Swiss-Prot record:
GO terms for molecular function: ATP binding; ATP hydrolysis activity; proton-transporting ATP synthase activity, rotational mechanism. HAMAP family: ATP_synth_beta_bact (MF_01347). SMART domains: AAA. It is found in: Plastid, Chloroplast thylakoid membrane. Keywords: ATP synthesis, ATP-binding, CF(1), Chloroplast, Hydrogen ion transport, Ion transport, Membrane, Nucleotide-binding, Plastid, Thylakoid, Translocase, Transport. InterPro entries: AAA+_ATPase, ATP-synt_VA_C, ATP_synth_F1_bsu, ATPase_a/bsu_AS, ATPase_alpha/beta_chains, ATPase_F1/V1/A1_a/bsu_N, ATPase_F1/V1/A1_a/bsu_N_sf, ATPase_F1/V1/A1_a/bsu_nucl-bd. Belongs to the ATPase alpha/beta chains family. This is ATP synthase subunit beta, chloroplastic. It is a peripheral membrane protein. PROSITE patterns: ATPASE_ALPHA_BETA. Produces ATP from ADP in the presence of a proton gradient across the membrane. The catalytic sites are hosted primarily by the beta subunits. The gene is atpB. It catalyses: ATP + H2O + 4 H(+)(in) = ADP + phosphate + 5 H(+)(out).
Length: 498
């Protein structure tokens, strides 16, 4: 699907002054605007309110048309705070949807929902912009080839592989490592695939956004010396912003990613943290627009809004957008309408477990709960499929035996079950891995493990060849050779102590 990018539109002062409206009512972030007969703006048009407030401060608020109310009035949602606006203020119809800068000049920069840079590094060096509202690519433009997207993270590549051009959900509560996993993926994609990423911070903490930016600069994903060599563009609409901004910031990030796919013909990674906040903002806006809520207070248009965003994230014959979306699960209830609607669009789910995080196993990906539609012999091959299934069976058997072990102890198990438990504990530890972006916490250099190395390592553990090695040798290592080297070092250390 080709974008027809436009050059930046004229300044507001140069807009045709004839299509002017006036504010008739303000309800929080929602404005009712009256226009002259026959001059009604279209749905999704951007409106601009310029003027001065009661103390003489300059006001410049952009809004988006959401409803036509009749009687020459429209209802619009503001993209920034509405403090200082008054009834009777002049509103200019721009005649087009919100447009944001796109292209290579966006890399290494931070934008808000309107595509304005907010990193104090000056204006963006591009005149190419694209509207944030577009239809999904037509069926004939889609690429249907199934291919694995190698991440270099063992637990993901082996047990819940990502699809190139697919959508992946990252499920987890607070503090189990969603953001660290996202940062590692951005780092690995940039270094191993040379691809670009777009990060959409939707309704999350400002502090986290700042930390992410600083850590990206430290890890080299954002190159401060030569900003053009950066591998990621950041778009933030944080928790403190009005619901209009949080509802549209995901589309701003997606529009930037679409340009890299369609015009630059690149494989792009789109991160959305957090897709639940997109739904939450839509729910707030829906209530403000006076719509009747549906189940659990969510907006009646929940499926439509989610679909219009998700269907644009896909592979075309030009390139692909692979999307990784953090999904906050309210009260750990997966049947809540927000996560349940998200599930319908996903090709793979990576579930983070608090239990594994408590054991110190990072990434804390639950190997039994995480799933992928790609884990089929005809896609990944027999060897990968068989190894993954045997790893899951071993871990499942260990899970079943844990109650018996807790009550009676290991000694009461049969010889075969004891062997299964020993191998499962090695597998559990071998699924951990030192991350590049977490070097400051772990003190261990990060490791990228190829899929072939991952499969070889788990096959060796399952075959019983490494039964003699201590389980701590498998903790926080890269490939299996590092585990055997670590075992030798541990043995030498224990001999020295004797």
């Amino acid at each position: 699907m080709r974008i027809n990018p436009t050059t930046s539109g004229p300044e507001v002062s140069a807009l045709e002054k004839k299509n002017l409206g006036r504010i008739a009512q303000i309800i929080g972030p929602v404005l009712d605007v009256a226009f002259p007969p026959g001059k009604m703006p279209n749905i999704y048009n951007a409106l601009i309110v310029k003027g001065r407030d009661t103390v003489g401060q300059q006001i410049n608020v952009t809004c988006e048309v959401q409803q036509l109310l009749g009687n020459n009035r429209i209802r619009a949602v503001a993209m920034s705070a509405t403090e200082g606006l008054m009834r009777g203020m002049e509103v200019i119809d721009t005649g087009a949807a919100l447009s944001v800068p796109v292209g290579g000049a966006t890399l290494g920069r931070i934008f808000n929902v309107l595509g304005e840079p907010i990193d104090n590094l000056g204006p963006v060096d591009t005149r190419t912009t694209s509207p944030i509202h577009r239809s999904a690519p037509a069926f004939i433009q889609l690429d249907t080839k199934l291919a694995i997207f190698e991440t270099g993270i063992k637990v993901v590549d082996l047990l819940a592989p990502y699809r190139r051009g697919g959508k992946i959900g990252l499920f987890g509560g607070a503090g189990v490592g969603k953001t660290v996993l996202i940062m590692e993926l951005i780092n690995n994609i940039a270094k191993a695939h040379g691809g670009v990423s777009v990060f959409g911070g939707v309704g999350e903490r400002t502090r986290e956004g700042n930390d992410l930016y600083m850590e990206m600069k430290e890890s080299g994903v954002i190159n401060e010396q030569n900003i053009a060599e950066s591998k990621v563009a950041l778009v933030y609409g944080q928790m403190n912003e009005p619901p209009g901004a949080r509802m549209r910031v995901g589309l701003t990030a997606l529009t930037m990613a679409e340009y890299f796919r369609d015009v630059n013909e690149q494989d792009v990674l789109l991160f959305i943290d957090n897709i639940f906040r997109f739904v939450q903002a839509g729910s707030e806006v829906s209530a403000l627009l006076g719509r009747m809520p549906s189940a659990v207070g969510y907006q009646p248009t929940l499926s439509t809004e989610m679909g219009s965003l998700q269907e644009r994230i896909t592979s075309t014959k030009e390139g692909s957008i692979t999307s990784i979306q953090a999904v906050y699960v309210p009260a750990d209830d997966l049947t809540d309408p927000a996560p349940a609607t998200t599930f319908a669009h996903l090709d793979a789910t990576t579930v983070l477990s608090r239990g594994l995080a408590a054991k110190g196993i990072y990434p804390a990906v639950d190997p039994l709960d995480s799933t992928s539609t790609m884990l089929q012999p005809r896609i990944v091959g027999e060897e990968h499929y068989e190894t993954a299934q045997r790893v899951k069976q071993t871990l499942q058997r260990y899970k079943e035996l844990q109650d018996i072990i807790a009550i009676l102890g290991l000694d009461e198990l049969s010889e075969e079950d004891r062997l299964t438990v020993a191998r499962a504990r090695k597998i559990e530890r071998f699924l951990s891995q030192p991350f590049f972006v977490a070097e400051v916490f772990t003190g261990s250099p990060g490791k990228y493990v190829s899929l072939a190395e991952t499969i070889r390592g788990f096959k060796l553990i399952l075959s019983g060849e490494l039964d003699g090695l201590p389980e701590q040798a498998f903790y926080l290592v890269g490939n299996i050779d590092e585990a055997t080297a670590k075992a030798t070092n541990l043995e030498m250390e224990s001999n020295l102590k004797k």
